[in-house]
Amino acid sequence: MKNKLLQGTVVLLCSSVVLRCLGFVYQILVVRISGTESLGILNMTMPFYMLLVVIATMGMPIAITKLTAQYVASHGQYVIGQMMRTAFLLVLALSFVCLLAACIIMPKAFSLLHTDIRVSQCFVVLIPGIVIVPFCSVMRGYFQGMQQMLYPSVGQIVEQLIRVFCGIALLLWVSPKDVLSMAMSLGAAAMLGEAGGCVFLAVMYLHSRRKAIAQQPNQSVAGRIQWMKPLLSLGIPVTATRLTSTVDMAIEASIVPFCLIVSGYTLNEAAAIYGQFSGVAMSLLTIPTVLTGALGTALIPAISEVAANGRKKELQQYCGRAVSVTWAFSLPIIFMLYLYGEEFGQMLFHIEGLGEMMRWLSFGAVFVYLGQTVVGILQGL
């Protein structure tokens, strides 16, 4: 069991390092090519997109990870196949509802919450992700529950590579004076990356379950309804938690630019400042999540299996070590960002005035890192 947790954490950590490096280099290139205004427009759109994705996903990755880890040893692949079919049908129905909301409700919401019309225009290119991401998340949850961390890790790397290459290519292709086109190009690149990662995971999923799928009979309606209860009982609390944070992000994305405009900044200046905050400062601040995110994800199936077998002493050891590693890794990076935030902004992104923002943000950063580890423990339980 310890080897599985260690192996899963190492795979996810290596993947997270690669993803973080690719994402960080991408952010640097985006800021240098397009500036922070286009990044600000996209990041004002993303919370509303994520709100719909969270609802469409309905916590299925965590639910599937936990149920797969619990049932695969005792019930076999047949039961897991029934659960996966139900999960796919559930996210399909939820994605359809969220697509309708994106087309009918969101335009009115943007007109009420944002004075910058470019935000609603940029949102259009993100709509395909409302269907792609939930299906991708279901397959990722299956592999994590089987403690096969390699496939979802490679899938995320494929997604990021496509996003980086397409994003840079589109930015160089559009006019540098057209800020909206650059923002939409970044959104389109993200959707192409999501699609590529989803195709990879689908191929790996069908390959890993080809024998079970061929031998599995058609599932009855009663069987699908029977699986709804455990999936939703685990998924709804996770969704409620994520909705809280996503709604908070959406409110922030609306209030911060509005307050900047009230303070005397123009629409363009407000978008640029918000891009500096969300795209530059937060990129630096999330560096420790390379470890804490990987650790939190790997803890879910490991904690779930230990808790199901009643091994309380081993459970306490896992929790204590995870929190200790989080503290040891996060604190030095927080101090570096507090002291040298301005220097990092000038050296990497060629922007000034980042130091004061980084000093304020670093005070609350430790709770973000610790929260990822603790959430992984609680979701495993």
Where are these regions (language model features)?
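Alpha-helical transmembrane segments of multi-pass membrane transporters
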Residues: 154-179, 337
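Helix-loop junctions and terminal segments of transmembrane helices
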Residues: 58-73, 285-310, 319, 323
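Interfacial/gating helices of multi-pass transporter permease domains
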Residues: 30-51, 179, 183-184, 227-234, ...
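C-terminal transmembrane helix end/exit motif
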Residues: 169-174, 192-220
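N-terminal membrane topogenesis motif
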Residues: 1-22, 78, 82, 219-245, ...
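Short runs within selected transmembrane alpha-helices of multi-pass transporters and secretion channels
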Residues: 19, 27, 58-65, 125-144, ...
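Membrane-water interface segments that mark the loop-to-transmembrane alpha-helix transition
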Residues: 62-107, 134, 316-330
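Short membrane-interface helical motifs at transmembrane helix boundaries
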Residues: 97-115, 120, 332-350
